[in-house]
């Protein structure tokens, strides 16, 4: 099962500051668009990655997630922005209403909060997620909004295509938010050992190149 989107947030204050996007998640690494999947009850994962995100910000992130009961996944993420020398903490819950299958789309809702120091910036977001199987791959759709303190909410929308490439799983995605240039992103992920995933992505926003590389361990 893919990792939860606090990369998402586009789970991340790193992303929020540039486009008010979620990645919060963490989406299923290395995607920024979230998927409707969650970990099985009693299972979890730890995702870690380095990225150059919107605005040229560079950051390290560690993001654990766990499903205490069927259909509910809770997660946290700590990001250190080495460009701004700031630290962001994010917490989110993801409730799956229907599980994705080959015959039916899956749906989930995500609620999250974030705090950045030393700027003392607070943010919150909401994301509706749908995943549908469309042979030979999967389509993921996101629609939500994010808000920082004393500012109006900003809507965002995202779409991603994910497909098995044989040697790895690959994706291409598009994310847009109010008052920000859209992001186009693509990348692979591959299991290099039992329960251990290596992943990466490269993308563009407003003429800038974005990239990330990370690992995800299931437990």
Language-model segments: which ranges?
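Transmembrane beta-barrel domains of Gram-negative outer membranes and organellar outer membranes
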Residues: 26-219
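Cleavable N-terminal export/targeting peptides
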Residues: 1-32
């Amino acid at each position: 099962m893919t990792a939860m989107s606090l990369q998402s947030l586009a789970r991340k204050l790193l992303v929020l500051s540039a486009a008010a996007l979620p990645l919060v998640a963490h989406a299923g690494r290395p995607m920024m668009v979230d998927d409707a999947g969650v970990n099985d009850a009693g299972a979890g994962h730890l995702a870690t990655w380095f990225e150059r995100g919107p605005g040229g910000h560079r950051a390290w992130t560690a993001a654990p997630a766990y499903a205490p009961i069927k259909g509910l996944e809770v997660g946290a993420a700590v990001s250190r922005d080495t460009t701004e020398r700031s630290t962001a903490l994010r917490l989110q819950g993801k409730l799956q209403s229907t599980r994705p299958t080959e015959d039916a789309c899956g749906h989930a809702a995500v609620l999250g909060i974030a705090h950045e120091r030393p700027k003392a910036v607070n943010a919150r977001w909401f994301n509706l997620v749908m995943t549908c199987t469309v042979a030979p791959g999967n389509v993921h759709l996101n629609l939500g909004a994010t808000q920082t303190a004393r500012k109006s909410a900003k809507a965002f929308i995202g779409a991603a295509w994910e497909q098995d490439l044989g040697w790895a799983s690959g994706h291409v995605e598009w994310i847009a938010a109010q008052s920000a240039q859209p992001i186009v992103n693509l990348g692979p992920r591959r299991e290099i050992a039992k329960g251990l995933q290596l992943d990466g992505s490269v993308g563009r926003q407003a003429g800038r190149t974005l990239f990330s590389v990370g690992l995800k361990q299931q437990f």
